[in-house]
């Protein structure tokens, strides 16, 4: 199964990386590697995260450190919708999808 990263999720990852890199480039690289590793894991185990049907039917959420990966598994791919810090409000998650 392949992993598809949506444009909003790409923006999220870019913003996270830029924010962390200002403080610690090494920490930013380490976290981005964790995200990549988790995306590869989702390609093999797409049902790994917790169901978040309260957001969208079929939506799942996986935690990495203090970040939440919101994704939806499909028959042939896993679509990453957003990556948010756990302190961020997720109520507007669908506003730009």
What is the meaning of each model-derived region?
Residues 2-59:
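Basic, Lys/Arg-enriched alpha-helical interface segments
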Residues 67, 72-97:
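Enriched for short, Lys/Arg-rich terminal
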Residues 22-25, 61, 81-83, 90:
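Short, low-complexity, polar/charged sequence segments that are solvent-exposed and flexible
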Residues 58-61, 69:
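A beta-hairpin/wing motif
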